[in-house]
Each structure stands twice: as structure tokens, then as C-alpha cells.
Amino acid sequence: EFECEFLGSVDTLISVSKLKTLVYNDPIKRNAGLDIYENPKEDHNYIITVDTARGIDGDYSAFIVFDITNFPYRVVAKYKNNEIKPMLFPSIIHDIAKAYNYAYTLIEVNDIGDQVASILFFDLEYENVLMCAMRGRAGQIVGSGFSGKKSQLGVRMTSAVKKLGCSNLKTLLEDDKLMTVDYDIIAELTTFVQRKNTFMAEEGCHDDLAMCLVIFALSLIHLLPFRPPPL
């Protein structure tokens, strides 16, 4: 465990006082962008949230694996790669999701993520891809197995949806309901700031992992009441 004082910028989503308390550990396994902190455990419940990039050396395609069996929820693995092509990314998600007890996956589908979600669900036949049902002014409801035309694979990140996710993420982290010891995640949180009436990375920084956290916070709003208890 390494104590490193992460000093947040001005207007970070997470308070500077909280950021100062975060410490990081080395992963137990590291391979081609995948860092593992805890191996899969029998009877544990996991969810994976995914943020996809185009794979041309700009932003990173990223996902985070969360253990949601008990409070506090924990980051148990993360993947971050700025060269992986969108056509290949679903296979990596598929392998890790299966390993973590067929984890539910929630994919942000504003851009190329739509293709990733489709390949994972239709081509790789992975059934635990979460969907969103459109509910008019209520926005998007996250869940599985919706029927009807107004449902889609993954979550579409509108400004209202992102605002809700950011608010919930702030509560989770500052109330110690979500724990992470990943250096890259903590580093991104220190530069995830308010800009143009939303939260995003500071100029020259990345927020791919931070957005995976936001997607996770969104999923909890809808999913947890329906989550089956551990066997």
C-alpha cells in the first residue's frame, strides 16, 4: 500500500480532502492493459462498466470490474488500452466478464460503444449485457431483458444522465461506499473537473476510467433493488 498525496485540481468532482486520503496498491497481475487486484470469488456478484474509444492513440478504451457483493463496493480489476480496436475490444470484455462469474456489463453507447455492445451481445452471445429502457421524462432505466422498441443495449450518456451519475459517484466515494486502490483511477479523479457545465478531464488529461466510475454509479441507481442476494 502506497501513500501518495493526490492533490486535486480546482473544482474536482471529488473533494480535495477525500482525494488526499486515497492510497494505491500494485495489482496482483498485470497484462496488456489489464490490472487485477482480486481474483474472482465464488458466489460473489460483479458488474463491469465500459467506456469505448476508437483505438487510434487518443482516448483509451477502458473497463472496470466491481465487486458489488457487499458494502463497500470494490474495484477488483481494470483495463485501459489506447490501441485496442473496437472490433477486438468485445472479446476482451467477454473473457473477463465470464471469468468474474458472468458479470453484468453496462456499456456507454454514444459513439463506437454501440458497436462493442452489439458484438458482445449478438456475435459473442453474451447475455448479461445490460440494457436501458427509455421512459420519457424519467430518462433511462437500466436493467436486463426489457422488451419493446424503446430499449437499447447499454446506456446513452446525455448531459442529464451524466449529471446524475456524477452526483451518485461523489456520494459513493466520499461516503466510503466505493473503494479503489488503482493508481490510474485515482489519478484521473484528481483531474476530473467541472468544465462547460459538466465534469470532464482537464485539458491534456484523460477521463476514460472516471467515466467507467460514472457509469457504475448510474447502474446502482436502478440495479441494486433487483440484485439477487449472494447464494
What do the predicted segments below correspond to?
Residues 137-138:
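Surface-exposed loop and turn segments in beta-propeller and other repeat-based domains
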